Amino acid sequence: MLAGLIVVKSFNSGRTASVHTSLTSIMTAAATALDIIIMAAGKGTRMKSRIPKVLQKLAGRPLLQHVVAEAQSLHPRRVVVVTGHCADEVEAACAAFTLPEATPLEMQFVRQEPQLGTGHAVQQAVPKLPDDDGVVVVLSGDVPLTEASTVAELVKACGGDQLALLTVRVSDPTGYGRIVRDANGVVQRIVEHKDASDEQRASIKEIYSGIMAAPAKRLKAWLSQLNNDNAQREYYLTDVVAMAVADGVAVVGHCITDALQVAGVNSPLQLAELERAHQLRQAAALMEQGVRLADPARFDLRDDVRGVLAELSCSTDVEIDVGCIFTGRVTLGEGARIGAYCHISNAEIAAGAVIHPFSHIDGGGDA
């Protein structure tokens, strides 16, 4: 899901509507109740920051806010956020997030103390999910760009009686859990990087994203059987895959080609790389609709510091020079020309206007 909804008037409004229609049709076809668990307890030590990792910002928005907004768009029964490191700060921030839809979201918090692995984190959330019907989706609070339609497809693949894993093939799977399939291509288990053999590390390129959809009743049973007999002495959520196979439950590896959707953040460098890749996609979306960007690698669309969600609406024949930053809700009229290194926030630029280089325009938070 894009952090900034790019609206190109007379072009993109129909496309946006079709995306929402598609998402609704997928969830209707899945025909199952949905609960979502978001894991947000990690310390994020490699960020070397006092700010919790899930509150680090991408496109002006906390990573966790991206994920909560994604969850909201799927219209679940309830969302449980698992916190741990700086729990008070994360929970307070999460409760104050500005979300794109007006639909109320039932969001609860549970704390993972101590932090003993991903399986242990989900175990803490289970008491908040009293119903045994439906599907439980597990998301990661530091994986911000998964599209809601992708998660909806995963729920559909689960079908209420299968275990569905979101996977992707990458050139360098170092550090990720690898998908182990049998000779017929059927998923058998996930092996974590530190527990993988040299042969598995060299040959398996398909990785588990950290996102899964599972039948609620089955998931609860598997979680109760987890142990920490591994190199890290942690309770791995990934161990439920082997349990599903042992129980005769089909395991579906829903493999996507877009690695950006499952990219996580563990360091400032990874955050910067993900930011730039995301901004390039936003720039490309504009250019595909006719907006002329002098250099798409030097374009930024972000939420503003007051929390106004990013939305850039462009009419026809708009030109944007290098290094421009747009924050909050901005409208550019027909033929508007934005000079280099301008910062425009919550403003409407008239048709035919010429904004000179290095201009800073702030229309306030109610544009």
Q: What residue ranges belong to the model's regions?
A:
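Conserved N-terminal catalytic core of the sugar/cofactor nucleotidyltransferase
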Residues: T21, I26-D35, P62-L139, V143-K156
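Extreme N-terminal basic, low-complexity initiation segments
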Residues: L2-I6
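Short aromatic/basic micro-patch
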Residues: K57, L145, A213, G264-V265
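N-terminal nucleotide-binding beta1-loop-alpha1 segment
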Residues: T28-S49
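Low-acidity, Ser/Thr- and Arg-rich intrinsically disordered low-complexity segments
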Residues: S10-S18, S22-S25
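Conserved core of the sugar-phosphate nucleotidyltransferase
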Residues: D88, T146-A231, V249
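Left-handed beta-helix
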Residues: L23-A30, Q232-A367
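Short glycine-enriched, charge-decorated loop/helix-capping segments at active-site entrances
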Residues: I51-K57, L226-D229
